[in-house]
């Protein structure tokens, strides 16, 4: 056969992309991550809390649970048929889901991934129920009858300015059964803020992530100007507030497309973002002395993981993702083995400020996992990250991180960086 052979690439079905990646720090890969790991604390047993994508994992980060399909009054109703997840294998495919959103199903141009997980007759539910029933412990049963929960990526029901989001692939405004850490902090007069790169002074660029702020889904926040202002910040606001010493006590900082996501970004772009955030905090000595920076990523990006995954509930857990704790109080050069996931960040905030779990069904109700046990002795359980700190032996020095210039094209999924000021 001679000549150039061409063929059309298959259309993406959005059911997994890149499977593996390899980074070699011994040859210079990820120098900033390496420096942070050597000087502060990391975990080899931290997980995404939902076996799903970016949106669902950001929602659980702020609520300990999930968003659901609701009507204009906040009543639980069924979504259009084309938006209901059906993981049963589609005949004639390599185990592709029968219906997995974004235009599939009986309703064109909709699609999505809602599951009525309290109904064993709903697609895919009985299989998970049977799996959970065989566990040597009782998983958390937090699916509520009649509710269809979001498992993957949908835009928030509100734009960041508080107007209704009328675009496709949008979860309805969350009027009932949706309590965020922002609500809880405000109720206890603790300052908080969400800083999204690309916010652009109220005119979000394409790079701004519309699915990544868990507070932006909540009617209670987005229709209340005094609460809504807490989500109307960008990267420049974060840098200036850190310099001036008026950063909110709990601050969520979100990169745009310099997020290191597999397939379209690069790790050294993400490292530059992290280095800039760390430098902003360390550049204010008073702020640095009372701050914990938690650096994590929303989900694996499709990468395979061989580690233990604890079945916690219908929703997860999922594979391991990185977390680093950068703080004067972080254990130096420490690798934590305690079982943690994204809800551990909620539990950390709640432990630090003496707050209660958000709701009766949120996963911050779970007990703390056994310290340094890769598999918790009592399950289900997740840690609160306190095992990564030693408050008796602070080290207030700072490190200079190498920064390289880099830019990446706009894309769609972003890992979160959380910054918390300790009380």
Indicate where each model-derived feature is located:
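N-terminal pro-sequences and low-complexity stem/linker regions of secreted or lumenal proteins
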Residues: 1-423
């Amino acid at each position: 056969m001679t000549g150039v052979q061409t063929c059309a690439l298959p259309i993406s079905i959005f059911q997994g992309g890149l499977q593996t990646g390899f980074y070699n720090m011994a040859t210079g890969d990820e120098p900033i991550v390496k420096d942070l790991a050597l000087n502060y604390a990391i975990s080899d047993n931290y997980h995404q809390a939902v076996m799903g994508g970016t949106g669902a994992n950001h929602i659980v980060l702020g609520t300990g649970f999930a968003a659901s399909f609701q009507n204009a009054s906040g009543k639980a109703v069924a979504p259009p048929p084309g938006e209901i997840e059906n993981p049963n294998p589609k005949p004639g495919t390599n185990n592709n889901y029968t219906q997995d959103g974004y235009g599939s199903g009986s309703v064109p141009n909709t699609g999505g991934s809602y599951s009525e997980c309290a109904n064993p007759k709903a697609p895919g539910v009985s299989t998970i129920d049977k799996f959970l029933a065989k566990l040597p412990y009782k998983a958390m049963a937090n699916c509520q009858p009649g509710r269809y929960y979001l498992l993957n990526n949908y835009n928030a029901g509100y734009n960041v300015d508080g107007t209704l989001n009328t675009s496709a692939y949008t979860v309805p405004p969350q009027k009932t059964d949706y309590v965020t850490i922002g609500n809880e902090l405000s109720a206890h007069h603790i300052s908080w803020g969400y800083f999204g790169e690309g916010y652009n002074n109220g005119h979000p660029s394409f790079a701004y992530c519309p699915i990544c702020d868990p507070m932006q889904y909540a009617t209670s926040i987005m229709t209340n100007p005094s609460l809504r202002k807490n989500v109307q910040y960008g990267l420049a606001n974060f840098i200036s507030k850190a310099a001036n010493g008026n950063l909110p006590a709990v601050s969520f900082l979100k990169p745009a497309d310099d997020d290191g996501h597999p397939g379209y970004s690069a790790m050294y772009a993400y490292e530059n973002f992290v280095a800039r955030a760390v430098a902003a905090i360390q550049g204010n000595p008073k702020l640095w002395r009372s701050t914990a920076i938690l650096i994590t990523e929303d989900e694996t990006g499709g990468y395979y993981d061989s580690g233990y995954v604890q079945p916690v509930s219908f929703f997860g857990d999922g594979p391991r993702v990185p977390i680093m704790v950068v703080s004067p109080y972080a254990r130096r050069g420490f690798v934590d083995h305690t079982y943690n996931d994204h809800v551990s960040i909620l539990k950390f905030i709640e432990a630090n400020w003496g707050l209660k779990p958000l709701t009766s069904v949120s996963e911050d109700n779970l007990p703390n996992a056994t310290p340094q046990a890769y598999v918790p002795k009592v399950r289900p359980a997740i840690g609160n990250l306190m095992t990564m700190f030693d408050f008796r032996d602070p080290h207030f020095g700072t490190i200079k991180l190498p920064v390289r210039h880099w830019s990446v094209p706009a894309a769609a999924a972003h890992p979160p960086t959380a910054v918390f000021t300790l009380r």
